[in-house]
Every structure is written in structure tokens, then in C-alpha cells.
Amino acid sequence: AAKLDGKKIYVAAGSYEIAKENSGVKIEYSGYSKQVEITIEGGYNPLSTGTDLTKRDVAKYTTAFVRNTSSGASATSNSLLVLGNQTNIIFDGCTFNGQYGLSDAGSVRAVFVAAGGGDATLQLNNCVIKNFNRGSDGGSDGGAAVKVSKGRVLLNQVEMVSNKATGRGGAITTTAANSFLFMNNCLLHENYAPTAWGTSIHAGNGYVCMNNVTVLGTAATGGNSITVNGDAYFMLANTTIVGNSGNPNGVFRAGKNASLVVNSLFAKGAGNRTIYAGNITSGGYNVYQAADAGWGAVATDTDYSSQTLPAATLTDGVYQWTVTGVIDEFATWQAVINAVKSFDATVGQQFVDWVGEAGFGVDQRGATRNVNKMQAGAYDAGL
């Protein structure tokens, strides 16, 4: 542990198999004085290997950690990577590729955060998770991209695409009370859980906090399907969720624990319902269509059901839409920050500290918002 703690590993572009035969990689420590922090930084020009750390371009030089197509990784909980106790693993500029097709009945997820002591942390910055598949599970063990049992997952500028579980979390699932999922400037699209509940995210427990996140709902077939779902404590700020067909329970449901939404957009897309009435408090300035009556709207929220919004498509990595005169209440930067802090005295402040207050004054693309007139959702046209 002492030899690796604080180390940074620089990885050139290329495809690296870390799930072979019946095993992925498990990292776990015990008896050390703290979490062992290891950083893996990708995106380097292979020609500079061993000589030059300035030749880095994540968009041009893809560092991919992949599953061998014959591997089910059964020895590591059907996961490419498992994080156990006393770990703080940071990936920057990396791609995780399960190499499954959506029609496959696969078994392997990307990352399982499963510290028995709850002291595991996964940090992803400027990363992509794609083509993982839990289609062979029974419907209760989803989270094809990330499953959080105990620990913290911090996702900044992460794209999750084309991941699949049978049910409960096509991309992400959380299961324990001490699961913490923080997301900033993230995009989730084309993730599937066709039979039940969270087609993109199923948070059964713990805390889920989002800022500047776009989730495009994907078609499902189950009668209880919904895009983002669970009994966790949710906090959604500056976030966009767009529905699709086959999700009759809408785009967002917070079923049990007290949750908060502020300055977010809930669009029905090809579906016919957005917010499922549950334990939700509005922090104001949300724009929504076809929500359940009594979901918790306040005077500064806007029912946008009379307006037509664009189809569920991405432009410059976000769902873009145009504000009409129906909306006459707009959030300020400070109002959003205050709402986030009010969500939970401890977790709300932790999330603000992690994002940084300035992060609530830009949109998902990094475009500057008008701090006195902010557009709802992850996209801001600069009103």
C-alpha cells in the first residue's frame, strides 16, 4: 500500500484487457492508515511512451480498458473492476468498453464499488463507459456501468452509453444506505433496463446528487419502467431527463427518502408522463411536462405541458430547447446553491464543495449561464 499510495500511472492510447478468462481486477487493502490513492491517467500519444508527458490528447488518443469477449469475470463479481476497502482510485481520460452488443445476454459490468467498511472511492473524470451488459441477470442486480454497494462514486464529465441490464439500472444502481453517487456534467443515453424500474439509474438506497446531468430515457417494455428511479435520497440541480416510450411510470420517481429538485427539466419525449409523485420537495424553477398532480410543485415551477419540446436528441452533447414566454420565473445562481445546501446539511454541502460553487453557474458544456436568469436543465442558451 505504501508503495502505491499517491502514485500516478500514465497510460498511452491502446486497448488493454483487464477482464480475462474468469476474472477482472479487484483492488483492496487492509491495515493501512488511510485510503490508498492511485491515479490512472490516459490519453497519451504511444510514441511518447517513457519519454514525454506533454503529448496528451484524450480526444485523439483513446486509452481503453476492455473485457476479453470470452470473459464473464465470475471471480470478480462479474465486474471488470472491483473496489474494496481502503481504496481511492481515480481514472482520468479513460474509456471502459465491455464489448457487448445490446442484444447480448451478457454478465459483466464495468465497476463494482463494494467496500465492506464503506471506505472505497471511485473517481472518474472525462471518461466513457460503454457496451457493458448485465442482460443475463434476474433483474435485481443491474448497474451495467457502475454498481455502488458501499462507498463513494464521483463522476465528472462522464458519458455512459449503450449499457444494459435486465432490470433496475441499465447504467447505474446503488444498493446500500452508505452509497454515495455524485455526478457533475455527465451524459447518460442509450442505456437499457427493459423489464423493470430504472432504465438508466436505479438508486435503491443511499444518496444521489446531480448537477448539469443529461439523461435521455430509453425505450422499455416493463409496465413499471421509469428512467431514473429509486428509494434513495435524490438531489437534482440543473439536470435534464427526457422520457421515451415504454416507460409508463415516467422519467423520475423518488419513492421513499426525502428528495429535492431545483432548476431542472423533465420532458416527456416520446413518453406520456414525467414526474411520479413521491417524496419530492421542489427547490423551485423546475420546468416539467405531464407530471403527476401533487408531485410537489411550487409557485416558481412551470408546467410546460402546453408546449412542444424537441425529440430526445443530442446537440453538442446536450438536449437543447428554447424557452418560451410561458416561463416567467427563473433561477438565480445563488438560489440554486442555497437549494442544494438545504437538501441535507452534510451531504448537500459536500456536493457543493465537490462541484465548486462556480460549477452551478455554467451548463453541462461549460457555457456560462446568466447568474440572474438561468435556464432550467443541463443546457443554457445564455438568457
Positions of the model-derived regions?
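Short, small/polar residue-rich loop motifs at catalytic or cofactor-binding pockets
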Residues: W354-G356
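Glycine-rich repeat segments that build the extracellular carbohydrate-interaction surface of secreted
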Residues: A1-K20, E37-P46
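Short, acidic, Ser/Thr-enriched surface-loop or helix-capping motifs
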Residues: D363
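Predominantly extracellular beta-rich ligand-binding scaffolds that present long acidic/polar faces
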Residues: A19-G31, Q35-I38, L53-R56, A110-G116, ...
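Residues within well-ordered beta-strands of beta-sheet-rich folds
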Residues: K8-A12, T39-G43, I90-T95, Q123, ...
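Right-handed parallel beta-helix/beta-spiral solenoid domain characteristic of secreted/periplasmic
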Residues: Q35-A105, N131-N133, K164, T300
